[in-house]
């Protein structure tokens, strides 16, 4: 729908089925205490991310809650290192968003410690493989 000079909404906005789905999701988040589960797991996730600092191509790691960013040292031109590192991580079995030379990691709120361990292990493999490929 249009409101004067601004576009507002999407094709699914305000449709009863979409509203019902949104309310159902909110009920599940409340019933299963999803946000508190994520809050309790976030220190473990952040600790896992920080454990990757020892890899030589990692420039900086930062995070908050269940979200983290890993800056990969720039190589030749901006964005190239991040994209190439992302491909190595994807080949190692982990998928996420890479923007420029930053790997953005945001696990599902419903994950468990074993999933965090798997994510960190695959990130370590992918980033290490990227580092080795630079040396060849």
Predicted regions and their residues:
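Conserved N-terminal phosphate-binding loop of PLP-dependent enzymes in the Aspartate aminotransferase
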Residues: 4-136
